[in-house]
Amino acid sequence: MSEAPLAAKTEDSSLRLGLKENWQQFALLILINAFVGGMVGIERTVVPLIGSKEFGITSTTLVVSFIVSFGVIKALANLVSGQLADAWGRKRVLVLGWLVGLPVPFMIIWAPSWGWIIAANALLGINQGLAWSMTVIMKVDLVGPKSRGLAVGLNEFAGYLAVGVTAFLTGYLASRYGLRPVPIYLGIGYAVLGALLSITLIRDTRDHVRLEASASSKQSTPMSFREIFVLTSFRDRNLFAASQAGLVNNLNDGMSWGIFPLFFASFGLGVERIGILKAVYPATWGILQIATGPLSDRWGRKGLIVVGMWIQSAGLFVTAATRQFEWWLVGSLLLGLGTAMVYPSLIAAVSDASDPTWRARSLSVYRFWRDLGYAIGALSAGIIADLFGIAWAIGIIGALTFLSGTIVAAVMTSRSGREP
């Protein structure tokens, strides 16, 4: 059955835009995104150590190869997620993401070789690209234009708090029971619950998009996906600034995911304390987005993005230059603070600059570039670490992060999140 175009008016007069008006579906989507985040969290502490300790991999580049497969596949899944969301509906894409993610924890538990881990992460990339994208897009659909920063902040809070909590729990469980299989059991629970809730309780939000489009005073011009890709990637200065900042943000996150556990372990830190450091960064990032998302609605996006990128850079420099747990903890806190300022502001900035009828596709292009940063960050950090050492890899990517913030300062135009 063909779907009505997104610009068409909805016939359901009971529909309203707003967080209060849609709080039940919004709350369910927050819970589901916590499960999506938890799927990544099971890997943050233990998977790099599985590569080095169980499979005896000595090359940093090879150890981080699982992040490269994850990042490339997730970026491509992001790219098609907006198209699929407009054609099939948001709920169907969300459910598909969970069905693809169900085998991932079992593959990690039973993996007889590193190739299985890489394959599991390709499936995880599809899961994250489809499921996380839909939770973001559906929340933005529900709340309308005035609370985008709040919606994104709450979404990312749930996801990255779950990443942090799960990274801590897997580190703790690994210190007690080994790297496999016990820590990975968490992922089985996340995948089953996420799939069941998505299938049984979530409703599609395309009628909310039609409602917003019908209320807009702007005349929407139909655009092809190629036009949206070029506009989001290069042509629109705000969308370009957001896309490059998103790429660099996840570039340094991919680097930290892959080589921080190896860096800390090289100085004799145990897996439980590594788990603490790996938890502090995403947990700080997740919790503070409750504040930074709404602040971007009030203050505008640009300032938070610029300062946030510079704070991330400072956190990376502190981590690279020091050799003590306490200083690494400070570096992780700075990374979390900076990312909390940047992450919801970037998604809200892209939503601000996009028409409701092609917003999902523009967000999918932004998320393509952003999550391609995982692969670029892990691969470049692995190569630099093999050639010059891990500290050099962290420092060089810290400098690149500072440069990205400077580009946003020069290119992006200031805009309040409350502007239509």
Which residues does each predicted region cover?
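Juxtamembrane intracellular "pre-TM" segments in multi-pass secondary transporters
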Residues: E3-W23, D207-A242
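Helix-loop boundary and gating motifs at the non-cytosolic
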Residues: K20-G71, N238-A245, N249-F267
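Residue-level signature of mid-helix packing/kink "hotspots" within the transmembrane helices
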Residues: G71-L79, G164, P282-I290, Y374-A375
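Helix-to-loop junctions at the C-terminal end of transmembrane segments
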Residues: A77-G89, A174, L288-G300, A385
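C-terminal ends and interior cores of transmembrane alpha-helices
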Residues: L99-P112, I311-R323
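Cytoplasmic helix-loop-helix junction between adjacent transmembrane helices
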Residues: A120-Y160, A348-A349
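Symmetry-related core transmembrane helices of the 12-TM Major Facilitator Superfamily/SLC fold
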Residues: V182-I199, I394-A410
